[in-house]
Each structure stands twice: as structure tokens, then as C-alpha cells.
């Protein structure tokens, strides 16, 4: 049950947590990005650099992942596709995307995009915090305990 990381927007502290977990649990973790990223050497950690372009990294993740894999992404449409294919998905803040909540998350994303395009909303998400880091680490640990030894 490998882990696939949409690494283009993955915060460095989350990459570090994932790398430590990959080594500790000996679980294959692949970071996919359209730019070079720094990762520690490990037989359990790999990176794939894809060309720049719309959804290129997303498409690579979808082509490679399988049912039961874990996908880490902030991209809600990618999360929806991965869930449809049977993956477990959560974002770098540790929030799980599920069959039960993904439609609502997509609707909210689309609504906020419309509001931004209309100039009604100008801000983005809150800055990444220590609490977000802890929530992610806890969520990852729970997933690994359930899935890594299967």
C-alpha cells in the first residue's frame, strides 16, 4: 500500500514527516512534482519530476496509484478521482477526503472559485500551523497502523 504525494504544494514539514514515516514503516512513498524537490536518500522514498502543465502531476498519480493506496493532496478534484479509484486521501493538514464528504468539498471549492473570480473573496487558507502539522502526523500514524502491515 504505497503513498503517493502531490508534492507541488506539499509543505516541507509534511514532506519531512512523510519521509520519516516511509523509512520507519518501510513503505514506498513517491513524491510527484513538476519541479525539483529535496528528499533524503532511502530505498523507500522516490521522486518523479513531471513536465510543467495543467494536471500533469495529478494524471501521473492517477496512472500509478491503486485501490487501497494513500494519496496526499490539497487538490480536491484529484482527491475525488483517487477516492473513486479506491484510494484513501487526506490533505497536508490531516483532513480526510472520503466518499461521504468529497461532494461537499468539491461544491465548496467551486463556490469559492466563483467568489474569487467575482472579486468577492481575496484571501486564501490560513497559514500552515504547528497544529496542522500535528493533525497530519496523527492522521498518517492512524492510517499506517491500519494499513502498513497488511
Swiss-Prot record:
Its protein name is: UPF0178 protein Maqu_2186
User: What is the species of this protein?
Assistant: Marinobacter nauticus (strain ATCC 700491 / DSM 11845 / VT8) (Marinobacter aquaeolei)
InterPro entries per record: UPF0178 (IPR003791)
Family membership noted in the UniProt record = Belongs to the UPF0178 family.
Q: What NCBIfam families does the record tag this protein with? A: PRK00124.1
